[in-house]
UniProtKB/Swiss-Prot annotation:
It catalyses: GMP + ATP = GDP + ADP. NCBIfam families: guanyl_kin. Essential for recycling GMP and indirectly, cGMP. GO terms for molecular function: ATP binding; guanylate kinase activity. The lineage of its organism: Bacteria, Bacillati, Bacillota, Bacilli, Bacillales. InterPro entries: GK/Ca_channel_bsu, Guanylate_kin-like_dom, Guanylate_kinase, Guanylate_kinase_CS, P-loop_NTPase. It is found in: Cytoplasm. It comes from Staphylococcus aureus (strain Mu50 / ATCC 700699). This is Guanylate kinase. Residues 6-185 form the Guanylate kinase-like domain. Pfam families: Guanylate_kin (PF00625).
Length: 207
């Protein structure tokens, strides 16, 4: 039978919810076969991050030039910085039958939904907004004013979870990782995804 086209897996949620930590845990698992689509951003690199591994870090001018060339599936400006997903890698990798994993901001996920309505959208939620505030303070990288700005934005983003197919609470990283992997596995078994393949198999068997 022909190879099944890959899934586009979109993980997003409020800043500070732990998207990057959960994504790293998923890709540390030897059983993970997803291809990670690295996002591009104009924000400053954080301690421990690697250019070309965690993000492609670009200047604002370079990023805006790529916008003009229509080189993004999605892009958004969030708290003064651009974030975007390069388009060609995603399309090529899915056509090869690989699942592509995107870790992006909520505004970006809205754009992806319009262009890839069949993608799998997972909202990573904090146990509470107080818990989220503690995580942001614990980073020690931002002012109180910036943290409050992120909390205000998080409130709006939580209200937008109806745009997603699944909600995973990040109360513990390993549990969140396992939940996401189970969701992806179940998605591959949906009748809508496999029916055409098996109908083709039956028709070929009758020849």
């Amino acid at each position: 039978m022909d190879n099944e086209k890959g899934l586009l897996i979109v993980l997003s949620g409020p800043s500070g919810v732990g998207k990057g930590t959960v994504r790293k845990r998923i890709f540390e698992d030897p059983s993970t076969s997803y291809k990670y689509s690295i996002s591009m951003t104009t924000r400053q690199m954080r301690e421990g991050e690697v250019d070309g591994v965690d993000y492609f870090f670009k200047t604002r001018d370079a990023f805006e030039a790529l916008i003009k060339d229509d080189q993004f599936i999605e892009y958004a400006e969030y708290v003064g910085n651009y974030y975007g997903t390069p388009v060609q890698y995603v399309k090529d990798t899915m056509d090869e039958g690989h699942d592509v994993f995107l870790e992006i901001e909520v505004e970006g996920a809205k754009q992806v939904r319009k262009k890839f309505p069949d993608a799998l959208f997972i909202f990573l939620a904090p146990p509470s907004l107080d818990h989220l505030r503690e995580r942001l303070v614990g980073r020690g990288t931002e002012s109180n004013e910036k943290i409050q700005s992120r909390i205000n934005e998080a409130r709006k983003e939580v209200e937008m979870m109806n745009l997603y197919d699944y909600v995973v609470v990040n109360d513990e990283v390993e549990l969140a990782k396992n939940r996401i992997q189970c969701i992806v596995e179940a998605e591959h078994l949906k009748r809508e995804r496999v029916e055409a393949k098996y109908r083709k198999m039956i028709l070929e068997a009758k020849k």
